[in-house]
Regions:
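Alpha-helical transmembrane segments of multi-pass membrane proteins predominantly involved
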Residues: 2-175
């Protein structure tokens, strides 16, 4: 729900910059959530639970899956160099440009709070020990390829943003 609120910050700005930022945010959010929900589904299949405790020791069970989840969570938290960081810069920057500084400040504060919860999940994945009913599910090749593509997009959208943003701006101004 918070992520949708961040997108609406760009809409509230009411400018081309804000609308472009919102569309960019949607693109980043799409690939990031694909990765997150794929990992949650995979963990639930292996453990029978989607509770945070089911992620305990994920790094030991599947280091690659833990890495994918970590990158996706850091992107959702708005940490550079991932796409979520640049998307938040765009929508919060649009708010500031439109004199909604208070809205940008609230969004940033909320992002910091959300990051705390994302870091708690990462702590469970990397530092907590798995329970005795250890499970191991090896993801199929198509899962691994899809997740690799998601992570590549999350990184590329954070590092090489100009071509994407230019295309989005052209689309936004066409309406």
């Amino acid at each position: 729900i918070a992520q949708a609120g961040y997108m609406l910050v760009g809409v509230a700005a009411g400018t081309e910059f804000g609308f472009s930022g919102t569309v960019y945010y949607l693109l980043v959010y799409l690939v990031t959530n694909l990765a997150v929900f794929a990992i949650i589904s995979w963990v639930e299949k292996g453990s029978g639970s989607s509770a945070v405790s089911a992620f305990a020791g994920l790094n030991r069970r599947s280091p690659g899956m833990a890495l994918v989840m970590m990158v996706a969570l850091l992107s959702l938290g708005g940490i550079p160099p991932f796409g979520g960081f640049f998307a938040k810069v765009l929508v919060f920057g649009a708010a500031v440009q439109s004199h909604y500084v208070w809205l940008a400040v609230l969004g940033i504060l909320n992002s910091v709070i959300a990051l705390y919860y994302y870091l708690k999940i990462m702590k469970v994945m990397y530092l907590d020990k798995p329970d005795e009913t250890s499970w191991k599910v090896t993801p199929a090749l198509q899962w691994r390829v899809a997740l690799a593509l998601c992570i590549a997009c999350i990184i590329l959208l954070g590092v090489i943003y100009a071509p994407w943003l230019n295309g989005i701006s052209l689309a936004v101004t066409g309406f």
